[in-house]
Amino acid sequence: MFLLLPFGIIILVAALIIIFKAIKIVPESRVYIIEKLGKYDQSLSSGLNFINPFFDRVARVVSLKEQVVDFPPQPVITKDNATMQIDTIIYFQITDPKLYTYGIERPISAIENLTATTLRNIIGDMTVDQTLTSRDVINTNMRVELDEATDPWGIKVNRVELKSIIPPADIRSAMEKEMKAEREKRANILEAQAKRESAILVAEGEKQAAILRAE
């Protein structure tokens, strides 16, 4: 009797461990990718789930929340052969956890490479002036092309933003000179307007004074 007691405790502990490993509680906005003997078996959604602890394992935990990736500045050549430094922010969501897991190796790196290629293609058809003044158009075109290209990977691109567009040093210098000239022009116009208004006030004052003297 007493000899069977430790054996019974061992059986009970083993059973509890098996049950514990069989239970998988998936958090909200998460999906667990389950593999059985190294092969995809199922995707567990949020809530209480059960797996076979002997043959099943959690191969990957996939977030369904919107994710943001900020890629470093990349050199891009415009249609008129100017090299622009552009950094891009991508907002995306995983819509198919299975495709995201097995569709492509290192998906974030793949998105970065695809973003660089798409950006080069779009900017390559635009001049410097068009690039600097068409940010919204570039964002939209980037989103459409990236969304279509990443769909086979179970990814939806919600938004693309060009965080900064930096032209070459000589173009920046020319732009700064142009802006300075424009500021000086506005200042001269304001100064001339102020002098004209002052002269009008002086003339009006002299006119009123002359009228008073005549009376």
What is each stretch, according to the model?
Residues 62-215:
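Elongated, amphipathic alpha-helices that form coiled-coils and helical stalk/scaffold elements used
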Residues 1-75, 100, 104, 112, ...:
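Interfacial loop/beta elements and low-complexity acidic/Ser/Thr-rich segments
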